[in-house]
Amino acid sequence: MIPIAYNVRSVVQRPLSTALTALGVGLVVAVFIGMLALANGFGAALAKTGSRQNVIVLRKGADSELSSGLGRDVASIIAADPHVATGADGRPLVSPEVYVLVPLAKAFDTTQIANVVARGISDQAWQVRSNIAITEGQKPASGRAEVCVGARLTTRFPHTGIGQTLHFAGRDWTVTCHFTAAGSAFESEIWGENEQFMPVFRGEVFQSITFRLKDPAAFDEAQRSLQADKRMTVDAHREADFYAQQSQLLGRILSFLAIMITVIMAVGAVFGAINTMYAAIASRAPEIGVLLTVGFKPWTVLVSFLAESAFIAVIGGVLGCLFALPLNGIVTSTTNWSSFSEIAFSFRVTPFLLVLGLVFAVVMGVIGGFFPALRAARLQVVQALR
């Protein structure tokens, strides 16, 4: 085999063309990782939203909370179910919830309006969802027009500070606290008391009922029991699975766009690698002739130049990873197509995506270097030495 040092020396001797080719590959890799990090972050935000200990109950046939409706009688039936866990005070850990969209102007441009989820909860919701933590202020008091704002909203919408007033549904609502939810979609919601939300939004109807399972392993049994109850027509979902499913449509679209955009850009990067390698082979034809003369097989020449092209691509891949790393943790937002509400989430650049970016770079390098390397391997010794 031809020593790899030969290819490394060749790359170093052509700094400008090597740098331009590597930069082209790096930009493609950065876009590839960035788009996948966007899809990854969106999926992770919704996946964190649910707990495998909880069950969310919707009207039968409803595929989202927005299209569901459940009466007070259903809430009472579920609260009495033996599969429901109880709190330290002996009360069932059940939260009948109102789920509506409210239009709010954005902080950076008040002419832009976004739909934000307003969730009316019971007092038990804070125990049902163990990932919720109040970071500032006090929980809304029962019987008052008070709300708690998710951490992701406080920097994106005005009037969300403690003591400030939000206006929606024809009423003023005082912000009494901020909360986090382990980076989940709940952080993009406004929470208030369900009994305060019901009269101004949808009357005597809840959109969903969430409860904590007494035994998380007994979900199937609880699901069968609830769905077989003739007094109500409901579907029961494990909360974690329900919210993960909500991310599938947009997640797939973002992943598809990532692949399409990077494939288009990759074509340009591959042609750049082809031009670079053809130029390298043309200038080193005598060297190739010498290699063939001293006994190196044509296939070793092919492998050598493929390795050289891949090496340049790896440099580009590393650059692309470095370009993409600062994206990690940057907060952005999009519309959740399942609920038509705005959801804020962070770009999520993982080690897996970085490795995937490097592999993609190597693939581009090998494709771009194959035909020039094949030409080098097929050179006739006499022709090469001229």
Tell me the role of every PLM-derived stretch.
Residues 85-88, 105-113, 139, 153-155, ...:
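Mechanotransmission and gating elements of multispan inner-membrane complexes involved in transport
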Residues 4, 18-22, 322-323, 351-359:
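Hydrophobic alpha-helical transmembrane segments
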Residues 374-386:
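Short cytosolic juxtamembrane segments of multi-pass membrane proteins
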Residues 278, 283-332, 356, 360-364, ...:
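Transmembrane alpha-helical interface segments in multi-pass membrane proteins
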Residues 15-42, 251-287, 310-319, 364-367:
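Hydrophobic alpha-helical transmembrane segments of multi-pass inner-membrane transport and secretion
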Residues 26, 30-117, 136-138, 143, ...:
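Hydrophobic, regular-secondary-structure patches
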Residues 112-156:
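Short beta-strand boundary microenvironments
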Residues 328-355:
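Short juxtamembrane loops and helix-capping segments at transmembrane helix boundaries
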